[in-house]
């Protein structure tokens, strides 16, 4: 049953709540449990919707863990979706992470640019721009997701220097043919 609700066994690699430390030099920090969409391939369905933002105390424990483990050079902010956290709180979390000298890379795993493109605002971009280098790992699974609004939001992120990558999930009947993948 545990592998059904937690198929990647993330809970087994959590030295502190909401922080997965599976690989020596990187961690996954879950900062909230809200998503703009529930993906059929989600490996964290057990968490989605339970209280939204992770508590400040839990985040403090995660950030302190990163600070105290100098082998960690890369953090992936995830959740839920980090971009559903209010701007002020996201700014605070990024400032804390960026203050850690040995942390070289901050990645944000998000579906917001493709599912809630109106969230990509000038204010959000001004916050993100302060914390370079930042990298976005997004999910786009079909070319129809790339609407004009989505393209505008992605362009705003690219214009402030954020590299944008897509973690495309191969889905039967959706994108499992070469023509669709080529177009995507």
For the regions a protein language model found, what residue spans apply to each?
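N-terminal [4Fe-4S]-dependent radical SAM core
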Residues: 1-28, 46
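N-terminal start-of-chain detector that recognizes signal peptides
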Residues: 2-4, 49, 107-111
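Generic, ordered loop/turn and secondary-structure boundary motif
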Residues: 9, 20-24, 36, 49, ...
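Domain-level signature for proteins that mediate thiol-based redox and metal-cofactor handling
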Residues: 18, 52-53, 67
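Canonical Radical SAM [4Fe-4S] cluster-binding loop centered on the CxxxCxxC motif
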Residues: 22-54, 108
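Conserved AdoMet/S-adenosylmethionine-binding subsite of the radical SAM
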Residues: 60-74, 83-184
